[in-house]
Swiss-Prot record:
GO terms for cellular component: Cajal body. The active site is at residues 224, 444. It comes from the Eukaryota. This is SUMO-specific isopeptidase USPL1. It comes from Mus musculus (Mouse). Residues 719-733 have a biased composition (Polar residues).
């Protein structure tokens, strides 16, 4: 490339690297252009005016001509340096990297003159600042170039200088100080770079050279570990102000330190000023530095003497500043408070889930194996889990209270070398790295601190009595040992957006609410937000840990949240007063809209209801209940497909049990049968969680608006405690007890549901509702014929009877008082397993009372006496049946014997109560006296049951009429359960044998009286119509003869279904072999089933 190739048409040189192929021109910035060498210009590249305001704005050069440029702040709102300096001082000439072909010899001569003679004051060269990395004056390295005697104290750099250049530099300095411009010469023009005076503040530029120097301790007896600590402490501005204001210099260790260091600094500055004012520079002799060393060593020896008993350190042995610095701070508690900060270690193992949170207060924290993205606000590092020993788990330090001076120790160093990256804002203050202690591999420590002009001073006790100035901190990232942050003045966060200004996981200082859980904080209704995990002791609201909140919030259904609410509320609601539970009314229901999630909303409601503080003891819980009924609180927290009433109804039951408040249920327009079934299926799956609860969420009745669920609960609380305990113990029985069915009821209903093909239409219409309500259950495990009678079975039967009468009552009638009988239309279509769960979970001793007699409670003795009377009747009936069984065996053994058909009666006067007017058909097996005796016993038993119900207050609602079919079914279930197997019917015609169990028993031809009586009674009482058939005469002897050789016929599918419902395979095999074990019973007993 020739000189002409760098010129344009008018003879002016080109700007930039050139126009050769492969060389691209630099982008332009604005219309003035951009200096191509801007990266070498500034020390830190930031505007000092913006940095004083907490902002980091870069200074960028703008070209104003082909040879000159000016540095301006990139912030559009900042005009620095315009107005602070004269325009002539702001303009920088072209760098020497850009050649000027027309003036090569002139610039070379100018550089020669700079070495051998002082420059003219008004020369353009004086308006520039030529520096190199090893320049002694600009970089603040006072390496002994003032005089020959002083250079002896700096052996590290004086060898690179010659006496001629040193003297020339002193002459240049004197001339430039008169013009307030600092100029330095260099020996290597190839590495010269242009630096504007705008980098330094005006105060620093105007100060004499001596004020840019700092004295330091010299290394003796391997005390670099102590020298680096003292050098870092004396340059901390916050510490210096505190010590000078509050400490006595005679008694305080740190006061003595600052006093002696200030004395040594004054010695250096005073002698240097004398040399500047014209005195001989030889005044600065080694004697002055000997005096400086004496001051510094004296205070160092005093501090070492105080540390020696605690550190067990000796002269000549190496120590670590990590241990010595905290011990030194403990000597003065008021000084230690400037370094002490509080934080918490948060750890959670991703492998085993082990977690802990430790709060600590320290002045120096050690980090090892830090994450690559480490930052003071993301202070995380890798460590093992103490529980499972899993490696590479993350532990994080969360600052809670930061001190004015923050120190951290890094074993492996920092990930990045740029210390500006680690500046941060905390509680509205800017924290900036001002000191760094470097650790070298040869067990040597060096202190670096940030000066006011933005440069860094290196305090190495092996490099002379004065610190060396550097443009940037030249500490490698891996050798960064201890980092010290200092808190600057309060800076508005919006003005320092370039730095991380938000503190994660801490409470905001301004008092603004920043809740981590919107549902919980909005429902709490308080001004305090929920603290983070790092503050367990200052939590507002519930003392509930994070795993517990997650366990509630991550439920698998809406029902789980509702049941969790019952689990948490019910024990406290039964024991606390209404004032304590009524404080929930202060909940602001509209805030629940913050999080429209079905599970989280109900979980938040659980926490609010369980842990609401007692703010207003005199308030009532009705306001909350009313808001629940209106759907303001629950509906937004539940999914839109789920009706708000489903949860609010359960809440009303809970609140009404806690405080005697009758709560009206809300009216729902349309039923939701599918959702009720889903709730019941979920309740079946979560049976282990709800067995101990008398409240069941299955019993939601969206179709009966007037049914109050509060009155019965209130009545339950007034009952005797013994009955309550007995009722709950009965509920806690194993589930297989509740799942078993009475064998006759199950068998008959299975017959009616399966054998509809040959049944009359009237029977089908009547049995349809019964089969829907009580479907059949297959399996021998459900046969409880050999179970011992107990009070729980009788109470279950009574509750089943009350439920059946409730079902048959009109929908628009007055509501019953008990919430246990509230079965919806959707529940009627549910499966049989769900209905059995519903029956099994109902409290056993609950009784129905009339509305006018709510306060009256029947004594326990009356109910027990009535039940004993019924039990005696049953025992007597069993004796009759056993006697009938024996006669049946005799009848089979003598088939030619004609049974007597005469009618005898046996009065039933066991209890002195008149028999009912309802007539029962006469049986046609055995003797007529036995049949009538059994008939009377059945009537008496039914009457005693009804009488016992009426005396004990167990009457149904006024609108509910009694239904004998249900009671007959249960009576037969109790009567026939002790028998070995089944009792086949004895009707003469096969078409009439709807309930026939087998053909092994002899059958009689019914007389005309018996047939007419049977049909008449059935038609009158139950509108029962048997199929019409022709009258046939059958020979009684032939029937009796053929009855002996008949066996069970299992060929019919109807009979197969019947036996499948009732017998197991082994039972059927035994029936075919032994006919005497099959007793006989009258098929007319099943007329009402």
């Amino acid at each position: 490339m020739t000189d002409d190739s760098l010129k344009i048409g008018n003879g002016l040189p080109l700007v930039g690297p050139g126009t050769d192929v492969g060389i691209s021109s630099l982008p332009m910035l604005g219309y003035l252009g951009k200096n191509y060498a801007s990266a070498k210009v500034t020390t830190d590249g930031h505007c000092p005016a913006c940095r004083a305001k907490g902002k980091l704005s870069a200074l960028k050069p703008y070209r104003i001509s082909f040879q000159e440029s000016v540095f301006l702040c990139e912030d559009l709102q900042c005009i620095y340096p315009l107005g602070s300096e004269s325009l002539t001082n702001l303009i920088s000439p072209d760098s020497e990297d850009c050649p000027t072909p027309s003036k090569p010899q002139k610039r070379k001569r100018l550089e020669t003159n700079c070495r051998n003679s002082p420059l003219p004051v008004h020369s353009k060269k004086t308006r520039s600042h030529i520096v190199t990395d090893s320049e002694p004056i600009v970089n603040g390295k006072y390496n002994g170039e003032v005089c020959d005697d002083f250079s002896a104290s700096f052996p590290d750099t004086s060898a690179h200088q010659d006496p001629a250049s040193t003297a020339a530099s002193v002459e240049q300095s004197e001339a430039l100080e008169a013009d307030d411009v600092v100029v330095a010469a260099t020996e290597d023009p190839a590495t010269v770079s242009v630096t504007s005076e705008l980098e330094m503040p005006a105060k620093s530029r105007c100060l004499p050279l001596c004020q840019t120097l700092c004295v330091q301790w010299k290394n003796t007896q391997a005390l670099c570990w102590l020298d680096c600590i003292l050098s870092a402490l004396v340059h901390l501005e916050v510490l210096r102000k505190t010590v000078l204001e509050a400490c006595s210099r005679e008694e305080c260790v740190f006061g003595r330190l600052f006093e002696m260091y200030h004395q040594a600094d004054e010695l250096l500055h005073t002698h240097h000023l004398h040399g500047v004012t014209g005195e001989d520079c030889k005044k600065l002799t080694s004697e002055i530095f000997t005096e400086i060393d004496t001051c510094l060593n004296k205070v160092r020896d005093e501090i070492f003497a105080k540390l020696q008993p605690k550190l067990r350190c000796t002269l000549g042995d190496m120590e670590s500043p990590v241990f010595a610095l905290p011990v030194l701070l403990k000597l003065e508690p008021h000084v230690e408070s400037l370094f002490t900060y509080s934080f918490s270690w948060n750890f959670e193992c991703s492998h085993c889930g082990h977690q802990y949170q430790n709060r600590c207060v320290k002045s120096l924290v050690t980090f090892t194996n830090i994450v690559p993205e480490w930052h003071p606000l993301n202070a995380a590092h890798f460590g093992p889990c103490n529980s499972c020993n899993s490696k590479s788990q993350i532990r994080k330090m969360v600052l809670e209270r930061a001190s004015p001076i923050l120190m951290l120790h890094f074993v492996e160093g920092l990930p990045r070398r740029d210390l500006q990256h680690y500046a941060f804002h905390f509680e509205g203050s800017l924290y900036q790295v001002t000191s760094v202690i470097q650790y070298q591999a040869n067990n040597h420590f060096i202190t670096w601190f940030l000066d006011a002009d933005g440069s860094w001073l290196e305090c190495d006790d092996l490099k002379g009595p004065c610190a060396k100035r550097h443009v940037t901190c030249e500490v490698p990232a891996s050798e960064t040992h201890i980092v010290i942050w200092e808190r600057k003045s309060q800076v508005p966060i919006e003005e320092a957006a370039c730095l991380p200004c938000m503190k994660p996981n801490v409470q905001p200082v301004s008092g603004e609410e920043q809740p981590t859980c919107p549902a919980l904080c909005s429902l709490a209704g308080t001004a305090t937000s929920e603290p983070s995990v790092a503050h367990p002791t200052s939590m507002a609201g519930a003392p509930q840990t994070l795993p517990e909140i997650q366990a509630v919030a991550h439920g698998d259904s809406v029902l789980s949240g509702a049941k969790g609410m019952v689990d948490s509320i019910l024990p406290s609601a039964l024991e606390e007063t209404i004032q304590e539970t009524a404080s929930v009314s202060q909940v602001d229901s509209k805030d629940c809209l913050l999080e429209d999630k079905p599970v989280a909303g109900s979980a938040a409601l659980v926490r609010v209801l369980a842990f609401q503080p007692q703010d207003s003891p005199g308030s009532s819980g009705s306001s909350l209940v009313s808001s629940l009924c209106e759907g303001k609180l629950v509906a937004p927290c539940v999914d839109s497909s789920f009706p708000s009433q489903a949860v609010s109804t359960d809440l009303q039951a809970v609140l009404s049990q806690a405080g005697d408040t009758v709560v009206p249920n809300p009216v729902t327009d349309a039923p939701v049968p599918v959702l009720v079934q889903e709730l019941k299926s979920l309740a079946t799956e979560k049976d282990s969680q709800t067995q101990l609860l008398p409240l069941k969420t299955e019993k939601l009745d969206p179709e009966q608006p007037g049914k109050s669920q509060a009155s019965n609960l209130r009545k339950r609380e007034t009952t005797a405690s013994s009955k309550t305990v007995a009722a709950r113990s009965a509920q806690n029985q194993p589930r297989k007890e509740d799942q078993k069915r009475a064998f006759v009821g199950s068998w008959v209903k299975g017959l009616l549901s399966r054998g509809g093909a040959f049944m009359p239409t009237c029977v089908l219409s009547q049995s349809r509702a019964v089969s829907d309500l009580q479907p059949s259950v297959k399996g021998a495990s459900n046969f409880d014929g050999f179970k011992t009678k107990s009070i729980s079975r009788r109470s279950k039967r009574m509750s089943r009877k009350a439920k059946h009468m409730e079902e048959l009552s009109p929908r628009n009638s007055s509501p019953p008082l008990s919430w246990t009988a509230a079965l919806t239309q959707a529940a009627e279509n549910a499966t049989s397993a769900l209905l059995r769960e519903q029956e099994g979970s109902r409290p056993a001793p609950l009784r129905h009372r009339s509305p006018g007699n709510e306060s009256a409670i029947s004594p326990a003795s009356r109910g027990d006496a009535a039940e004993d009377q019924v039990h005696k009747l049953r025992l007597k009936l069993l004796k009759k049946l056993k006697a009938k069984k024996k006669k049946l065996a005799a009848l089979i053994s003598s088939p030619h014997r004609e049974p007597s058909l005469s009618d005898h009666s046996e009065p039933a006067s066991h209890c002195g109560t008149p028999a009912s007017d309802q007539s029962e058909p006469v049986s046609h097996c055995g003797s007529p006296n036995d049949c009538e005796s059994i008939e009377d016993l059945l009537k008496e038993l039914q009457h005693q049951i009804d009488l016992a119900d009426s005396k004990s207050g167990c009457t149904s609602a006024p609108d509910a009429t009694s239904n004998n079919s249900q009671s007959h079914e249960e009576i037969l279930a109790e009567l026939l359960s002790p028998t070995a197997m089944s009792e086949p019917s004895e009707s003469g015609e096969l078409e009439l044998r709807y309930l026939e169990m087998g053909d092994s028993t002899p059958a009689q031809a019914p007389s005309e009286f018996s047939v007419v009586s049977l049909n008449t009674c059935l038609k009158q009482d139950h509108d029962y119509c048997s199929p019409e058939k022709g009258q046939r005469e059958v020979d009684l002897h032939s029937v009796m003869d053929s009855a002996c050789i008949r066996t069970l016929n299992l060929g019919s599918p109807m009979k197969t279904d019947i036996f499948d419902d009732f017998f197991s395979t082994s039972a059927l095999n035994s029936l075919t072999n032994d006919t005497l074990d099959i007793p006989h019973f009258d098929d007319s007993l099943f007329e009402n089933c």
